[in-house]
Amino acid sequence: MANGVSEMRLDWGSVRTRDGVKPDAAVLDVFVTSEDIDTVYDAYCRIEHAAFYNRDLEEAALPLTSALIEMVCSGRCTHWGLHWVTDALYEISLGQTAPWEAEAGGTGVADRCRSIIRDNLPRLYQTAGSITDDYTLASLVSITGVTDPDENRWNTFTQKLLDHDPGPDTAREIEDTRAWRTRNGGPAYEGCSWD
């Protein structure tokens, strides 16, 4: 296990999932602790299908978002776990409420997931300061860029990254996300344009 991880579980039975598919309760543990990329990716696919396939967010995305943030910020992830956990948060941050979820009464799931991320931005920014993997850091730039309503805080964060000569993925993501925020007028919201 990575860094003394205790079990990370989500009660999939208590939330709506895509097509009613309920992953094994221990899938989050595997996602976080496995050193094998194929095992982590398989866990990612099971989680994605249940909660955020094709960026269509199910009710399950709400507790999942909180769990993913905890994984990132607690240092509980293996290298591949962190890589795919931030990718999952990236997909959720860009998501929209699944049409069938809205019909079932789950309106605003996407904005509620982004709100969970927004509430944890100080922790995510602090964690980003210790991440050296370019792909993972680029994902955090995107996640914070589409959720942080505080333009000064986000610009300070990205400028600090630029001042330390980030990798090409991070530098490109800062440029692209800054341009997107300018076009969008700030962070993401349900129904905003992703162009």
Can you describe what each PLM-predicted range is?
Residues 3-16, 45-56, 99-111:
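Boundary/linker elements of alpha-helical solenoid repeat scaffolds
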Residues 42-44, 81-85, 136-141, 171-174, ...:
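Conserved hydrophobic register position within alpha-solenoid helical repeats
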